Amino acid sequence: SQCGSIRNISWQPVRRVEIPKANGKTRPLGIPTIMDRLIQQCVLQVMEPICEAKFHERNNGFRPCRSAEHAIAQVYKFVQRSGLHFVVDIDIKGFFDNVQHGKLLKQLWQMGIRDKTLLSILSAMLKAEVAEIGFPERGTPQGGIISPLLANVVLNELDWWISSQWETIPTHHQYAVTIAPNGTASRGKTYRALQSTQLKECWIVRYADDFKILCRKRSDAVKLFAATQQWLKARLGLDISPEKSGIVNLKKHYTEFLGIKIRVRQKGKKANGSPGYTVYSGMTDKAYQAMKSKVQQHTRAMAHPADTNDGSRAVDAYNAYVLGIHNYYRIATNITLDMRKIAFLVKHELNARLRRYTQKSGDKLPSYIAERYGNSKMLRYVYGRALIPIGYLKHKAPIFKPKKVNRYTPEGRAEIHKSLSCVNISILREMMRNPIMDRSVGVVPCKCSRKSPKNLLN
């Protein structure tokens, strides 16, 4: 029977692939077979709704309807509105390779996943042979469909432990909780009462294994750093990288989170006369250099096409890359200056290599370029196609995840569908990377329709 075949499944060896990292090292990926991926997807669809109900609100990585933008918005809120200017930076050493299998299965049991057949399937999957390595005793392979969910399960205990130190700590007196129209609960009276105690104020924001703990005082940050290091070792068997971990005073230094460096700068004064601070953020130095190098690669590809169609594809690939960078980094407050610096640095190469192909007019602008870049005087055309200007970008304040959005409730799905009334920008990027040069225009919207997120959800 099918049930029996699932119970007796034999996991195939996982293919191991090393991909290069920006620092010159490599990241190991475990690539399961097609059949194993199918089974992992089935298991994921069973487990994810259960786990989602138990995850912490500020766990933003690898979760439906959440993104890096939501994590950055949460950090901005704590830094600027709450005045938490001391950050505990902790880098877990080889997180995915050091997850303890026994501990993970116990955490799943505690979260409510108590089907022993399912747990035995997961146990067998974790112990599946890895090509050229053998049978692992710990770790979950990066590259598996279910690995991100399991990573969140492991660190969910950390989220709630940090939360229990301040945010959700029980009090003797029950203070009123205000519910905003969007569903957000405000516990301001509780937190004001807690500030009069000796408790250490701390808030966690996490995206996958990258997390920040924000504190009001340096003394609290020092204690939290030591306590978190000990807790990770004792509870999860994980070590930290001392050279990548520490305490950052945002008034003096940057902290890096998800490719964005963040600090505060003094601006004006508060009502009580104390100095006011505002968030100041931009691309990390690593991301800045990577973008400059990538733009130069795209420029060379546009300068030496095999034919006109190949040149048009190179322009589309360039536009897709720049648009993706703009969409991600526009939530950095200082991104306009960063983009203009990069535009200035690559301007000479763009002019030198593409001068004979460049014009000030060309084909009709696609709507997505016309809306965002149509008013730019930096707009140029290469091979008749518009070239997105790197330096034309305005900051956009990051948004929080709407409370009502939830894939697993009818009301939440209705909210999701409201935002899908137009084509998602990721689809446009896909179409730009793979333009259909030899077909009629009428075919392209059909392809978009089949790939639209709304159809994928149905």
Question: Where is each model-derived feature located?
Answer:
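Conserved polymerase palm-domain catalytic core
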Residues: 3-17, 54-58, 63-66, 70-242, ...
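Duplex nucleic acid-engaging cores and interfaces of nucleic-acid transaction enzymes
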Residues: 34-42, 86
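Active/ligand-binding-proximal structured segments within catalytic/core domains
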Residues: 39-47, 150-154
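Charged boundary/loop elements
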Residues: 45-58, 397
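A conserved non-catalytic segment of reverse transcriptases
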Residues: 127, 132, 236-307, 314, ...
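Non-catalytic, peripheral interaction segments enriched in hydrophobic/basic residues
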Residues: 314-369, 373
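Extended C-terminal regions of large enzymes
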Residues: 342, 354-442
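Histidine-centered nuclease catalytic patch
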Residues: 440-458
